Amino acid sequence: MSPASPMTPGLPYAPEIWIGVCTFRRPELEITLNSLARIDRAGATVGVVIADNDSTPSAQPLVERIAATFPMPLIYLHAPERNISIARNALLDHARRARARLLLSIDDDQWVGPDWLDQMLKPWREGQDGAPGSRIGAVLGPVHGVYQPGTPDWMARGRLHDTVPVRRRDGAIVSGYTGNTLLDLADPALSDLRFDVARGRSGGEDTAFFSAFLRAGGRIAFAPGAIVEETVPADRASLRWLLRRRYRMGQTHASLIARNRSRTGRLGQAGIAAAKAAACGGMALLGAGRPAWRNRQLMRAALHIGAGAYLAGAPRIELYGTPPVCAGSVQPDGQGGPKGPKGT
């Protein structure tokens, strides 16, 4: 990895790796930053950049206070407002201007272990061998939800808030997310790629981003040991929230497959989605006595309903950028953290 240049103004050196965090009214950001302060940098030059998506620079005092004693460069960016794609693009722009090689990202309610960076770098380094077209341009790590007391048993046992890559039968990763991600900014498939601002409130901007990356010939690897954890707040630990999220995911999927299709073609796909939703609903009825099974089938049904609704002309719902609900959090040592809003 070659040193990044030119240097970011005001820094004694130019980090070759930037870790980006988008934030929106979350005091849990302090937990995130405390965990990043403890990572093993393995000799790499690393910086952390925060993109605040609030209308006002509400996270700036927290970031500046922590920056005074942070063991690596910590930069604050104000990227208003209430549109997660704007914040994600601000991180991309910062890393590209600094001519950094790698941009990693985690969310502002997540924390990492000391070996997280090393675990993320391993598959990327291994993927640099071979012809340019076969090199790894992105790495995804797993996201594990940490449930609070009182979470329904079926939800906790099913690990329904965990995130891992979607794969084809041959093992190839076919989608991506931004909660635990590495991007090689030297990869041609990432050249000038940006997050869709039109999806910045509904969600799905990460799915669309990685879909474009894959269409451009990009390749994604998985880092199973690069685990990040996040608290599942009470307002998200419900079947209603899971169904709403799956509905939105269905809308995102449909918006991608609807490209270049005629209205007749879209309506045909909507009919297929409706049939799949009905089948999932029937399976949910058959498993009425088994909550975990039933609710998984309902989530699958919601996915297909969302796809069908979008293909039939329904508008996308908004999940992000709205006033959040307060929820407790769990710190990396397992102790209760500060209570604060959940936003993006």
PLM feature segments, named:
Residues 244-248, 262-344:
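Non-catalytic, C-terminal membrane-associated alpha-helical segments of glycosyltransferases
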